[in-house]
């Protein structure tokens, strides 16, 4: 996972009671509590761009978008996560102030310390959510997105985008221009081959 283990052998109920009094965010994974890695400003900018676009797009609908301060409960996997961005369209989630359970879209903006975990074990845990239709991994360094979409057969299919390709989020009916996702970032570094020429 790449994050320091803080506590072991804690139940989900104990975690919630303990976490209520903490100032920093921590994730709970099957009895273990892990500190969240701090994010770079570029990651925060991209998460904010996505949040703002989704918020505007979903305005007036039953769906709500949340950023990294809202917990997502994955009951079957016995986990609590703080996704960078998530969307839920559930009336039960709308009634719950602190914890969401029915995300249709989960987004993680990758960092070097969490990339392997976000692509592996965390994705496996998220897939246990019956409501989840899409899982988006955003690589700011490569300006690439790996969108995993669940098919009608229950299998997850990768839909990668890179550069100026639009990002199609079918779960919320949004096609996002690449410029909107990467807005306010420094210009993309020139290609290594072009730099030599």
Please place each PLM-identified region on the residue numbering:
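Gly/Pro/Ser/Thr-rich low-complexity, intrinsically disordered segments predominantly at protein N-termini
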Residues: 1-197
